[in-house]
Amino acid sequence: MKTLLLTLVVVTIVCLDLGYTLTCCNQQSSQPKTTTDCADNSCYKMTWRDHRGTRIERGCGCPQVKPGIKLECCKTNECNN
């Protein structure tokens, strides 16, 4: 009986994937790819143009942006690359 109970607990933990974190890219513009683990359930990629050219910012979450900034939010690992 104890073995069955232990098996059910292990299966439940594996199926629920407790403690899951999303991996988001967080490099800026044309920098080499870097990632970070995020507790948020989404990643973002912001794109805009300034006097230096096209700028890109990546990170965790889905922030509100000003007009003129393109925002893409997504919910899978490294989806904002």
From Swiss-Prot:
Swiss-Prot/TrEMBL keywords: Acetylcholine receptor inhibiting toxin, Disulfide bond, Ion channel impairing toxin, Neurotoxin, Postsynaptic neurotoxin, Secreted, Signal, Toxin
The keyword Chaperone appears for this protein: no
Subcellular location: Secreted
Record GO terms (molecular function): acetylcholine receptor inhibitor activity; ion channel regulator activity; toxin activity
Signal sequence residues: 1-21
One Gene Ontology term, aspect cellular component: extracellular region
Tissues expressing this chain: Expressed by the venom gland.
Keyword Transmembrane: no
SS bond partners: C24-C43, C38-C60, C62-C73, C74-C79
Lineage: superkingdom: Eukaryota
Family, similarity comment: Belongs to the three-finger toxin family. Short-chain subfamily. Type I alpha-neurotoxin sub-subfamily.
Name this protein carries in UniProt: Short neurotoxin B
Source species: Aipysurus laevis
